[in-house]
Amino acid sequence: MEVILLEKVANLGSLGDKVKVKAGYGRNFLLPYGKAVPATEANVKAFEERRAELEKAAAEKLAAAQARAEALEGASFTITSKAGEEGKLFGSIGVRDIADAVSTGGTEVEKSEVRLPEGPIRVTGEYDIELQLHTDVEVTIKLAVVAE
């Protein structure tokens, strides 16, 4: 299946690229989320007419993400949770908890933007958490998990 990308998609291409993808990926992800349109002649013409508008919107998204990254650069946050004697948490700290803690600090962060490659946090301590605010914008924050 050939599609035209309407925005930058990680590991696939950027705005305006005509790429070949598997039918399921196109039908179930790219098309429903508005990230691409099928590469028919009519869609190619329509895309070329809207290209400047789409590029402007993409530039605005990137600028907004960079502004959020500057606000978060070097920031540190603290989450308190119940823990046992050796610092092991009763439960865990997940992406939603981290997103809520950062959002209460004044900069809105979605839970899908928080990256925890090693899974949820289950022990007290200090952690470097990576936030991917845009496909091109990443920022690292410090998170301290302390016992109540």
From Swiss-Prot:
InterPro entries: Ribosomal_bL9 (IPR000244), Ribosomal_bL9/RNase_H1_N (IPR009027), Ribosomal_bL9_bac/chp (IPR020594), Ribosomal_bL9_C (IPR020069), Ribosomal_bL9_C_sf (IPR036791), Ribosomal_bL9_N (IPR020070), Ribosomal_bL9_N_sf (IPR036935)
A family per Pfam: Ribosomal_L9_N
GO MF assignments: rRNA binding; structural constituent of ribosome
Residue pairs linked by disulfide bridges in the UniProt entry: none
GO cellular component terms given for this protein: ribonucleoprotein complex; ribosome
Domain of life: Bacteria
Keywords: Ribonucleoprotein, Ribosomal protein, RNA-binding, rRNA-binding
One GO biological process term: translation
Tagged with keyword Ribonucleoprotein: yes
HAMAP family per UniProt: Ribosomal_bL9
Family note: Belongs to the bacterial ribosomal protein bL9 family.
Alphabetical list of PANTHER family matching this protein: 50S RIBOSOMAL PROTEIN L9
The protein's role, per its UniProt record: Binds to the 23S rRNA.
Name of the protein: Large ribosomal subunit protein bL9
Organism per entry: Marinobacter nauticus (strain ATCC 700491 / DSM 11845 / VT8)
The gene coding this protein: rplI
